[in-house]
Each structure stands twice: as C-alpha cells, then as structure tokens.
Amino acid sequence: MTINESQTLALRTAPTLSDATQKLLNGLMGLNGEAGEAIDILKKSLFQGHPMDNEHMAKELGDVAWYLANSADAIGYKLEDIFRMNIDKLKNRYPDGFDSEKSQHRAAGDI
C-alpha cells in the first residue's frame, strides 16, 4: 500500500465536518492526543515497571498516522507530497547527514 492509498482509506472513516478549519482542528487535536497515548506507553515502561508493549505502541502510531492523514487532507495535501517536502528540506539542511552544529545554527527562515 502506498502512502497516498493509506491516506485515501483513512479518509473513508473521517468525520464529516463543516469546513477545512474544523477538519484541521480535529486532526491536530487528535494527533496530539494519540501522540500523548504513545508517550504514555513508553513512560509506563520506563518509570512504572510495565513491560514495553510494542504491539500497543504500533496501534497508537497507526492512530497518529490516521490523524496525520486527515490533517494533511484538511490543508489540501497528499501525505506523499508532505513526506517529500520534508525529506527535501532535511537534505538541504543536512546534505551530509545530521550535524549537531548545523542543527544549533540554522539559517534564517529555515523552518
């Protein structure tokens, strides 16, 4: 399955909302909530004696991906395009791989 096919399938189960702002708000709030659930799994493993549950983590990461797909759609983007833009940005920022010096001293306007 391609990234865009996954996005299309995710959108089949998205709520019908009144406008793009509501879609984006729902997507970003959901993304934040699901990311919180993922970090909670790790927190419990590291600090509360729970075993690390990779299957549960994978399911929460799937929920993160679902909300990411919805958020991207709300602003009119396909996930493949967003992923490509991000990789292009990182290649430009770190042409020879990650460099902590370049990370600490990024060029003006480098978002």
What is each model feature region?
Residues M1-I111:
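Flexible "arm" and connector segments at domain edges
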